[in-house]
Protein backbone atom coordinates (compact mmCIF):
# COMPACT_ATOMS: atom_id res chain seq x y z
CA UNK A 1 0.00 0.00 0.00
CA UNK A 2 0.99 3.63 -0.42
CA UNK A 3 2.07 4.30 3.14
CA UNK A 4 -0.77 3.41 5.44
CA UNK A 5 -3.77 5.10 3.84
CA UNK A 6 -6.00 3.29 6.34
CA UNK A 7 -4.12 4.49 9.43
CA UNK A 8 -7.11 6.54 10.67
CA UNK A 9 -9.33 3.48 10.39
CA UNK A 10 -6.72 1.45 12.24
CA UNK A 11 -6.60 4.06 15.03
CA UNK A 12 -10.35 3.69 15.40
CA UNK A 13 -10.72 -0.11 15.27
CA UNK A 14 -7.20 -1.38 15.95
CA UNK A 15 -4.94 -3.56 13.83
CA UNK A 16 -7.02 -6.70 14.46
CA UNK A 17 -10.19 -4.90 13.36
CA UNK A 18 -8.49 -3.60 10.24
CA UNK A 19 -7.22 -7.09 9.41
CA UNK A 20 -10.79 -8.39 9.70
CA UNK A 21 -12.02 -5.69 7.30
CA UNK A 22 -9.22 -6.44 4.85
CA UNK A 23 -10.15 -10.12 4.81
CA UNK A 24 -13.92 -9.52 4.53
CA UNK A 25 -15.80 -10.63 1.38
CA UNK A 26 -18.82 -8.54 0.38
CA UNK A 27 -20.94 -8.90 -2.77
CA UNK A 28 -22.96 -5.98 -4.12
CA UNK A 29 -25.89 -6.71 -6.42
CA UNK A 30 -26.47 -3.60 -8.50
CA UNK A 31 -24.34 -0.48 -8.82
CA UNK A 32 -27.10 2.11 -8.86
CA UNK A 33 -27.85 4.68 -6.17
CA UNK A 34 -27.37 2.32 -3.22
CA UNK A 35 -24.85 -0.12 -4.67
CA UNK A 36 -22.38 2.42 -6.04
CA UNK A 37 -22.37 4.33 -2.74
CA UNK A 38 -21.99 1.09 -0.77
CA UNK A 39 -19.13 -0.06 -2.99
CA UNK A 40 -17.20 3.15 -2.50
CA UNK A 41 -17.86 3.28 1.25
CA UNK A 42 -16.76 -0.34 1.72
CA UNK A 43 -13.64 0.24 -0.37
CA UNK A 44 -12.73 3.37 1.62
CA UNK A 45 -13.38 1.51 4.88
CA UNK A 46 -10.78 -1.09 3.91
CA UNK A 47 -12.94 -4.08 2.97
CA UNK A 48 -10.47 -6.15 1.01
CA UNK A 49 -12.64 -8.30 -1.27
CA UNK A 50 -15.61 -6.99 -3.24
CA UNK A 51 -17.74 -8.73 -5.87
CA UNK A 52 -19.66 -6.10 -7.85
CA UNK A 53 -22.52 -7.21 -10.10
CA UNK A 54 -24.49 -5.07 -12.56
CA UNK A 55 -25.52 -5.60 -16.18
CA UNK A 56 -26.46 -1.96 -16.90
CA UNK A 57 -24.66 1.00 -18.44
CA UNK A 58 -24.23 4.50 -17.02
CA UNK A 59 -26.91 6.83 -18.40
CA UNK A 60 -27.06 10.62 -18.28
CA UNK A 61 -30.13 10.31 -16.04
CA UNK A 62 -27.99 8.55 -13.40
CA UNK A 63 -25.90 11.66 -12.69
CA UNK A 64 -28.24 13.02 -10.03
CA UNK A 65 -28.17 9.98 -7.75
CA UNK A 66 -25.38 7.49 -8.49
CA UNK A 67 -21.78 7.92 -7.34
CA UNK A 68 -20.56 5.77 -10.21
CA UNK A 69 -22.11 8.18 -12.74
CA UNK A 70 -20.05 11.06 -14.11
CA UNK A 71 -20.23 12.64 -17.56
CA UNK A 72 -16.90 11.00 -18.38
CA UNK A 73 -18.35 7.49 -18.08
CA UNK A 74 -21.82 7.91 -19.63
CA UNK A 75 -22.32 4.88 -21.87
CA UNK A 76 -19.81 2.70 -19.99
CA UNK A 77 -20.83 -0.50 -18.25
CA UNK A 78 -21.43 0.34 -14.60
CA UNK A 79 -18.95 -2.36 -13.62
CA UNK A 80 -16.22 -0.70 -15.73
CA UNK A 81 -17.01 2.76 -14.35
CA UNK A 82 -17.02 1.44 -10.77
CA UNK A 83 -13.74 -0.37 -11.37
CA UNK A 84 -12.08 2.85 -12.56
CA UNK A 85 -13.33 4.67 -9.47
CA UNK A 86 -12.40 1.99 -6.91
CA UNK A 87 -8.96 1.32 -8.40
CA UNK A 88 -8.18 5.04 -8.13
CA UNK A 89 -8.88 4.75 -4.39
CA UNK A 90 -7.35 1.33 -3.69
CA UNK A 91 -5.35 -0.09 -6.62
CA UNK A 92 -4.37 -3.20 -4.65
CA UNK A 93 -7.96 -4.15 -3.74
CA UNK A 94 -9.28 -7.58 -4.68
CA UNK A 95 -12.27 -6.48 -6.73
CA UNK A 96 -14.23 -8.75 -9.06
CA UNK A 97 -16.56 -7.06 -11.56
CA UNK A 98 -19.34 -9.08 -13.16
CA UNK A 99 -21.38 -7.33 -15.89
CA UNK A 100 -24.34 -9.71 -15.58
CA UNK A 101 -27.89 -9.61 -14.31
CA UNK A 102 -28.30 -11.76 -11.21
CA UNK A 103 -31.06 -14.35 -11.63
CA UNK A 104 -31.85 -17.51 -9.65
CA UNK A 105 -30.73 -19.65 -12.59
CA UNK A 106 -27.25 -18.06 -12.74
CA UNK A 107 -26.67 -17.78 -9.00
CA UNK A 108 -23.57 -19.99 -9.01
CA UNK A 109 -21.13 -17.13 -9.67
CA UNK A 110 -22.36 -15.37 -6.53
CA UNK A 111 -22.35 -18.32 -4.15
CA UNK A 112 -19.15 -19.83 -5.55
CA UNK A 113 -17.45 -16.56 -4.56
CA UNK A 114 -18.60 -17.17 -0.92
CA UNK A 115 -19.46 -13.67 0.31
CA UNK A 116 -19.91 -13.10 4.04
CA UNK A 117 -22.39 -10.32 3.25
CA UNK A 118 -24.55 -9.36 0.28
CA UNK A 119 -25.74 -5.78 -0.35
Regions found by a protein language model. Name each.
Residues 41-44, 65-68, 110-113:
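Short, glycine/charged-enriched secondary-structure capping and boundary segments
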Residues 11, 15, 32, 36, ...:
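Electropositive phosphate-/nucleotide-binding environments in soluble metabolic enzymes
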Residues 12-16, 39, 104-108:
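A generic local structural motif
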Residues 1-27:
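N-terminal charged helix/coil linker that caps or initiates catalytic domains
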Residues 47-90:
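Glycine-rich phosphate-binding loop and adjoining beta1-alpha1-beta2 segment
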Amino acid sequence: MDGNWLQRTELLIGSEGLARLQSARVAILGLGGVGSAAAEALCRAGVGHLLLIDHDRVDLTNLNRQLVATREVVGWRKTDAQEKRLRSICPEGDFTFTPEFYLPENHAFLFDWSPAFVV
